[in-house]
Amino acid sequence: MPYIEIRYSDISFDPKVQTFCHNPKFKCPNYGHSWACPPEAPYLEKVVSSFRKFYLVYYQFDLKSYVKQIKANHPKRKEEKILGSFYAKALMRDYLETELLSFIDEYQEDYEERLVLWDGYCRVCNNPKDKYCTYDSGKPCRYPDKKRYSMEAVGINVNDTVKNLQIELEWPPLNYAYRFGLVCFK
């Protein structure tokens, strides 16, 4: 399970990050449609600073191996098409969720409180029973204690945070793609 213990000072906060979800060039489809996304997501710099231990949990996906694997079954398929379909899949998100839940289960130290910042949008209500977030209906969040904020939704610049840790990201990803989550303990 890949994770790094980091310092609070490694975490790069910037309120402008919350505007990345909605600007003239891009609008995330979850912006304004989830209790855990901007504009509803709170800026959590002060809250996060009250915690004492921080772990960046991540999943690294080997894109080259993935392309080779797909090409073995579909030799005529172009690399661009393989990568395009990869980004549309929830594969990495599911892998990171597994890593985060494993890390939390295996964490042995005592703590009073825990804050987990996931990747992407909150998916707690994306299940057969609930089907969707209540945000658009105007009803309150069904599971306020289980709400999943992403690092970006609360104002963390993930790219700068990762750079602070000397992890090199490729844009666009050619060899490896990453997903990150942050687990904080008091």
How should these model regions be labeled?
Residues 1-186:
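Auxiliary alpha/beta "docking" domains used to position bulky ligands
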